[in-house]
Amino acid sequence: MDDNALLGQLEELAHSLGIEVRSEPIKKASSFSPGGLCQLKGEYLVILNSTATKEDQIYALAKAVIRFDLTQVYLRPGLREFLDDFSD
């Protein structure tokens, strides 16, 4: 699966879990951040660094969604395999 397809599937998964996904430029003086999960006014939000590579955005989004219980969520086989490998 290519990076664009994987990122798209991760974004769909996040939305199905009630997580808003935003792409914003993150300017951090001391180091680079690809983004991450936060909670704002009781709602989950993933902010992806729009200047990050697709690979870094995939990492940040995967790291966010694996915090949630995915056992009862239908995932395409390629996405489930990726997340299983990612969480190991």
Identify the meaning behind each predicted range.
Residues 1-33:
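Auxiliary, metal-adjacent structural segments of Zn-dependent hydrolase domains
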Residues 15, 24, 51, 67-74:
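Short, exposed beta-strand "edge-strand" segments with a Pro/Gly-rich flavor and a Y/T-containing core
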Residues 31-55:
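Active-site scaffold of zinc-dependent metalloenzymes
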